[in-house]
């Protein structure tokens, strides 16, 4: 098996060029204060934060459109009562803090079908790439949601892309994309996955529910279904994300893979942190610019925050009940399973979609594990070469002999 050279990633290896402005690991007190940054770092943080605000407003506008029907629902007394019942259901699950009850394991191996990916994917990877799919056997955790969740046609077919070496199985790096960012090609290039592949890893790119080919027919954008069905719909989407990924782990384990690392960005970072609290087959986990309290994050997302506030006001929603219910799918509600030295969190100081304070909350919950920051925003990962080298140094002892 080819060894990994932790510091060998040059800037020219990156398919998407970004400035190599170094970040650093957090100190014992957490992320750096503004005064601790160099002038160049402060300029990059400030400019990237402004760019993120524009992007955040655009995404929040899309989310607002998906949530408008919920305002009409709030006007109907029966739907408002049903939502309160659902909130209590997830709040009670969250209060138990038992990940095995909250996220039951798959009961059968997936029946996976595979076909070669397109030539562009194989050219990017410089290796064997296949697109795999299997039918999800997920059953909604909330009995009241089972008919609705079972009725999704495309969402209940799981999709992933697998990069494999001829002499496999190899240690596998799994990646979970962010909200609306499901394209395999984009993620492969953005995270420099061809370089990880050449370092000896097999790679698995997992598609979240309601994204990409899992988006239901007539969905206006990838990821629409995540927020289109109210809080209960979001909770079940997260439950299905965990369940279907565990089915993917079953498949990898069946094919002989015994070392799996997991990383994810944004919503994918949130999901990867949650999975690391549920399944002990994850050897190492790296949430990248994660959200950990989506309800608090959306509070800052204009105009979506106004739509949520209006809906809650009309329905007479109990704010404390909402906060308790949203903890159901938060990684802050469960203990991580990988050992402390196998957890690495990455945050962007200029991030205004998943503010660095979110990552810092996870860092505190995860016993102040390794925490790396870079001076960019949510999508412009300035110093990405630096944190990719950091990821490789972090992973090598666990993934390779």
Task: Name each region found by the language model.
Residues 1-145, 152:
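N-terminal targeting or regulatory segments adjacent to alpha/beta-hydrolase or S9 domains
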Residues 152-158, 164-173:
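Proline/glycine-enriched tight loop/beta-turn segments at coil->beta junctions
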Residues 174-239:
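Cap/lid segment of the alpha/beta-hydrolase catalytic domain
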Residues 264-272:
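Gly/Ala-rich beta-loop-alpha elbow adjacent to hydrolase catalytic centers
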Residues 274-320, 373:
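Hydrolase active-site cap/lid region
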Residues 338-339, 344-347, 351:
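Short beta-strand/loop motif that positions the catalytic acidic residue
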Residues 352-358, 383:
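Conserved alpha/beta-hydrolase "acid-adjacent" motif
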Residues 376-389:
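Catalytic histidine-centered segment of alpha/beta-hydrolase-like enzymes
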């Amino acid at each position: 098996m080819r060894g990994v050279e932790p510091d060998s990633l040059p800037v020219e290896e990156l398919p998407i060029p970004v400035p190599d402005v170094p970040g650093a690991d957090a100190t014992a007190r957490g992320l750096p204060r503004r005064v601790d940054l160099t002038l160049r770092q402060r300029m990059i943080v400030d400019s990237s934060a402004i760019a993120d605000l524009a992007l955040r407003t655009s995404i929040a506008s899309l989310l607002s459109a998906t949530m408008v029907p919920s305002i009409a629902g709030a006007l109907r007394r029966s739907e408002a009562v049903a939502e309160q019942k659902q909130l209590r259901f997830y709040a009670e699950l969250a209060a138990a803090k038992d990940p095995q009850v909250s996220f039951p394991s798959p009961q059968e191996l997936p029946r996976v079908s595979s076909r070669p990916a397109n030539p562009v994917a194989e050219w990017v990877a410089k290796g064997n790439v296949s697109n795999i799919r299997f039918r999800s056997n997920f059953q909604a955790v909330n009995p009241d949601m089972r008919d609705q969740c079972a009725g999704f046609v495309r969402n209940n077919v799981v999709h992933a892309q697998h990069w494999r070496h001829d002499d496999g199985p190899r240690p596998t790096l799994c990646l979970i994309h962010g909200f609306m960012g499901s394209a395999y090609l984009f993620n492969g290039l953005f995270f420099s996955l061809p370089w990880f592949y050449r370092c000896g890893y097999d790679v698995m790119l997992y598609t979240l529910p309601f994204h990409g080919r899992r988006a239901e027919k007539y969905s206006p954008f990838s990821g629409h279904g995540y927020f289109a069905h109210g809080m209960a719909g979001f909770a079940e989407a997260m439950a299905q994300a965990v369940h279907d990924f565990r089915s993917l782990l079953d498949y990898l384990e069946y094919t002989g893979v015994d070392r799996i690392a997991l990383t994810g960005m944004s919503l994918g970072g949130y999901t990867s942190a949650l999975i690391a609290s549920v399944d002990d087959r994850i050897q190492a986990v790296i949430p990248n610019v994660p959200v950990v309290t989506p309800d608090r994050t959306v509070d800052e997302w204009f105009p979506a925050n106004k739509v949520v506030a209006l809906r809650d006001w009309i329905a007479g929603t109990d704010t404390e009940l909402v906060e308790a219910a949203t903890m159901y799918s938060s990684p802050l509600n469960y203990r991580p399973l990988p050992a402390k030295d196998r957890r690495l969190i990455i945050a962007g100081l200029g991030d205004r979609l998943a503010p660095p304070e979110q990552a810092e909350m996870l860092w505190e919950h995860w016993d102040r594990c390794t925490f790396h920051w870079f001076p960019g925003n949510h999508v412009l990962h300035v110093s990405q070469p630096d944190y990719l080298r950091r990821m490789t140094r972090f992973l090598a002892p666990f993934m390779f002999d």
